[in-house]
Amino acid sequence: MSTDLDRPRLGSLFTRGHELPTAPARGEITLRARGLVVERRGGSGPARRVLDQVDFAVAAGEIVALVGPNGAGKSTLLAALAGELTPAAGGVELDGHPLTHWSPLDMARRRAVLPQTHTVGFPFTAREVVAMGRAPWVRTPRADHDDDLIAAAMAAADVTHLAGRAFPTLSGGECARVALARVLAQDTPTLLLDEPTAALDLGHQEAVLRLAADRARDGAAVVVVLHDLGIAAAYADRVAVLDSGRVAADGPPRAVLTTDLLTRVYQHPVEVLDHPVTGAQLVLPVRN
């Protein structure tokens, strides 16, 4: 039988851990993996290690690009950082605490995740999909800014004109931009973006990375999975090269994106050179 003495304790179960996050100081690590091991089983065979003792961190105010060949573990690492996979060993910390410390609501207020695929089971409009990014802030003072943040996110992702369109009727690129707007509207200190440029044309690819750079300049921590090494060189503060589930190199683009390393990791001859006019770093496959 419950008594009045139980009520404060029961109430704390519903409120514990739901404090609103504060903006991290520039340079403060928001997300860290230590000794991360992720395994997957296929059928009755032994487990396959897809991440092997990975150490990784991202700090407020920087963009870190995850690059590497297909199957290297980029998306798996992003999913583990997001708390969507249970590691076999090691762990992930968000804002200084293990992911298990946070409720799903608390994590949604601290990091936003853009997956590779964008599916919605009902014919919500594009604006309604973007508004889903504000769900973690319901019944908080930050909900007062919902309309402004939704409008700003849609403008930034160039989807304002799609506001009334049903999400399932949009093209692949339009769906990707609406999904990005949802992540922007969520307004979290950490952004995890899995191949945000994959379905986009050249102009929108550049626009998306400029948005990520703007968020980092404003103090967000951004992790982005990319296949285009030239875009990674142009926009990332750091590049982590994954190879067979391990981090082969992690550092500034010019230190990491070298001919020798990329040729070895991608198992194809690669040429790294500077643009003759702008000096920008270019990464090109060697073609006969």
Swiss-Prot record:
Reply yes or no: does the keyword Cytoplasm apply.
Answer: no
| EC class | translocase
Q: Which domain of life is it from?
A: Bacteria
Which SUPFAM superfamilies does this chain map to?
A: P-loop containing nucleoside triphosphate hydrolases (SSF52540)
Q: How does it sit in the membrane?
A: Peripheral membrane protein
Sorted alphabetically, which Gene3D superfamilies does this protein's record hold? P-loop containing nucleotide triphosphate hydrolases (3.40.50.300)
The record's EC number reads 7.6.2.-
Q: Which InterPro entries match?
A: AAA+_ATPase (IPR003593), ABC_transporter-like_ATP-bd (IPR003439), ABC_transporter-like_CS (IPR017871), P-loop_NTPase (IPR027417)
- Give me the residues that bind ATP, please: 68-75
Domain annotation ABC transporter: ranges = 31-269
List where in the cell it is found. Answer: Cell membrane
Q: Which UniProt keywords apply?
A: ATP-binding, Cell membrane, Membrane, Nucleotide-binding, Translocase, Transport
Give the UniProt entry's GO cellular component terms: plasma membrane
Classification via Pfam families: ABC_tran
What GO terms are given for molecular function?
ATP binding; ATP hydrolysis activity
The protein's job, in short, is: Part of the ABC transporter complex HmuTUV involved in hemin import. Responsible for energy coupling to the transport system.
Question: Which protein family is it in?
Answer: Belongs to the ABC transporter superfamily. Heme (hemin) importer (TC 3.A.1.14.5) family.
Q: How does it assemble?
A: The complex is composed of two ATP-binding proteins (HmuV), two transmembrane proteins (HmuU) and a solute-binding protein (HmuT).
* Record's protein name: Hemin import ATP-binding protein HmuV
UniProt gene name: hmuV
